């Protein structure tokens, strides 16, 4: 799941051993795809806006400068009331939650989306959205083919 997704706070806790078991998954491997912009906001002590993919459908397929431009457009649209479902959080606080869960449970694995896509030798195949379990092998997917690494 990407860090801008509205459900990211609940997602990072899926592997937690305490709490309501109906909100946990003990056998699923989870990964968080982090854009550079999020880390910039963490370092700068700024806010981060969470969105629903229903209102921001193109963010999933954007990286780097294109992601930053569109993400900031959605933030402005949210402030103007054009985006209805969103939540502002402190970027550093969200990062601490992610890192705390990684330390506590080993999940979610963190993959830096912009770095993976910038260095991909298969950029012609589209944006990388997944990897193998240890995140050292990135996998292209498309509407016609789902990538799997066993």
Predicted regions and their residues:
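Active-site cavity-forming subdomains of large catalytic enzyme subunits
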Residues: 1-150
């Amino acid at each position: 799941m990407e860090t801008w997704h509205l459900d990211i706070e609940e997602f990072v806790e899926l592997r937690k051993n305490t709490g309501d078991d109906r909100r946990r998954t003990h056998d699923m491997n989870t990964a968080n795809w982090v854009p550079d912009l999020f880390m910039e906001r963490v370092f700068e002590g700024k806010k981060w806006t969470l969105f629903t993919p229903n209102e921001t459908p193109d963010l999933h397929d954007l990286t780097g400068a294109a992601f930053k431009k569109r993400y900031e457009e959605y933030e402005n649209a949210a402030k103007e009331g054009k985006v209805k479902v969103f939540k502002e959080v402190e970027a550093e606080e969200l990062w601490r939650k992610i890192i705390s869960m990684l330390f506590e449970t080993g999940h979610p694995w963190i993959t830096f989306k912009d770095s993976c896509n910038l260095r991909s030798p298969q950029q012609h195949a589209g944006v990388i959205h997944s990897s193998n379990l240890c995140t050292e092998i990135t996998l292209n997917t498309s509407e016609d083919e789902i990538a799997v690494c066993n």
